[in-house]
Amino acid sequence: MKKPNMMLLVFSAMSFVLAMTAFVFSGILDKVAVSLDISVAQSGLLNTMYSYGAAFGVPITLILFRKVERSKMLKLMLFATILTTFALIYAQNFVQLLIVRLLMGISANSYGVLAISTILALSPKDRQGRSLAFYIMGSSLALVIGIPLTRALSAVLDWRSIFWILNAMMLLSLVYFLKYLPKADHEATKLDLKNELQFFKDGKTLLLLAYTLTMFMGYHAFYTYATPYLLLLFPSIEPLMSLILVGLGLASFTGNLIGGHVSDAIGYAKSMMLGAVLQTAAMLLILVFQPSKWLSVLFIIVWLMSAWFTGLQLNTGIAQVTDNKSSFMLSINGSLIQLGGAFGASLAAVVINLSGIQSIVFVTLLTSLALILIQVVSMRKYP
């Protein structure tokens, strides 16, 4: 991929669509609750079940289908996501919705892992960072425009209609992949459990996985509560909150884009160190300037940009350490992202109950310092 071609554009569009299927309920939980006659807290379980499917179901799925050629498996998982979306639209009660969301978390995130490994396989090594950044750009755009747009559309469309639109886009992408996606080298990409387990004995890989878990614990500890954090400290900011959320979305988009170029220029390991330092510095500034409304907003934007700058390095690192021969390790990395998020948000909830929402800064600051330590050890031991 010497330049973003049609294949990469379709992958990026699918990244947008699948991010929307994951996040869409977050923007309209209140409306979903009304339509299903349940509480907002209960409707939040639709996201929780999706995360559990992603965390635990993806590695198991890749093991069960390890003999299927990668591009065929990718199409199967996309087709399964289309079917689960139809099931979601026609579900008759809340329990059915929860089951379908669990299955959707498995199929959509299995597709995501296979998409990443396919993109990296199709890209020269010196452009893998930029290709991956272009792919992830789809999910960051979902945060910038997709979720706010969904909220606006919910005034005239119910949530099922929104999923009809997303499913139509998935169907078009599947048709394109069926016609144009090249087959992968089956011998190079099939899952060999004995060889896969060897990666768990590799210190460099384990440190990468530890970095992933730690980073997303800190990320979700703060980001999950970023909106109530700002509103509680600065109630006067509420009329501008939608604009601030757009700013946060743009920060994620920009950080991801810069991260791809920097990764190709200096390598993923140095980029991970740079990202950890930037996250730590941003958190320190958020803490120091906590009484200042606009400086708090500014440094939260800087922190989010540095987090998204770092995020794509993790998949690039796993791919390069395993010579892009392990979709299974990419799925483990994805599972740790989901688990880290769940642990971080839960830890933040405990901290908020014990000492107030302003204290969540300390959770993310500590995890950022831990990232620096992990990466120092990794770069010294495995130069």
Q: What are these model-derived regions, one by one?
A:
Residues 84, 95-103, 294-302:
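Paired small-residue
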Residues 96, 125-127, 133-179, 225, ...:
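Helix-loop-helix hairpin linking two adjacent transmembrane segments in secondary transporters
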Residues 37, 69, 90-96, 289-290:
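Helix-breaking motifs and short loop linkers at transmembrane-helix boundaries and internal kinks
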Residues 57-69, 255-267, 352:
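Helix-to-loop junctions at the C-terminal end of transmembrane segments
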